[in-house]
From Swiss-Prot:
The name this protein goes by in its record: Endoribonuclease YbeY
Biological processes per GO annotation: rRNA processing
Origin organism lineage: Bacteria, Pseudomonadati, Pseudomonadota, Betaproteobacteria, Rhodocyclales
Record's keyword terms, sorted: Cytoplasm, Endonuclease, Hydrolase, Metal-binding, Nuclease, Ribosome biogenesis, rRNA processing, Zinc
Positions of the UniProt region annotated as Endoribonuclease YbeY: 91-252
Gene of this entry: ybeY
UniProt key word Glycosyltransferase: no
Source organism of the structure: Azoarcus sp. (strain BH72)
An MF annotation (GO) of this entry: metalloendopeptidase activity
Keyword Ion transport: no
Chief place where the protein resides: cytoplasm
Gene Ontology CC terms, in alphabetical order: cytoplasm
Amino acid sequence: MPKQADGVRIVAVDAAGKTSRIKAERLEIDYGDGRRLTLTLPNDGWAHLDIEADVAGDDDGDLPVITIQPSACNAVALRVEVVQQPQVADIDLPVAAKLPVLTLEVQKALDGGDKAAAPKKHQIRRWAQAALRTDAEVTVRLVGETEGRALNLGYRGKDYATNVLTFVYGEEGGAPAVEGMPLMGDLVLCVPVVVREAAEQGKALDAHFAHLVVHGMLHLQGLDHEDDAEAEAMETAETNILRGLGYANPYA
């Protein structure tokens, strides 16, 4: 405990004006209702007097508050009050859902006008991520009509270039082959076919590319359109995803 500074005297004055000198390092004023004020004379530092309010008892909700109000240029009035701290409700907040992780590679096997018409990687990522419901590693390959036709013939037996092809590796029904591992697959977009379709259907080119990426990503995750019920469910999913991306219903 610091010693009282040299030359400092503590004098108590009673109601009759009688003074008594007190030898002390700290004064405690007890108000009798649990409030207590402690005055300490520091032996160093900036302050001439340290004042601390306290509340007796075990109620952690009681908070002592000191209010000071100037009463003159050389005087202040001090008040000690006890306020009840607000109780913090114990609420179980919902945990934010973890977004699926998309590992994306974009390959461009294009030249000339096809290359200029191809979407950018950041666009493809945005469209693919919107349709993603599980972690996935996806390669999107943008090709010309010759490669698109060869792939469609080799894998589907159809001798023409189609707008989008989906290839899933080692998975069945849109689920990873090994639990905990990401879904893996390729999307192949034939750029000149997509450009031609957009013009014929009166659609913005980016809207048509977005639709086909979403369509391919849903195929990758197990959705199909082999019958009317499947087709309706897939079209509804595509429409909702595209609406979230700011695009109109592609089937309207």
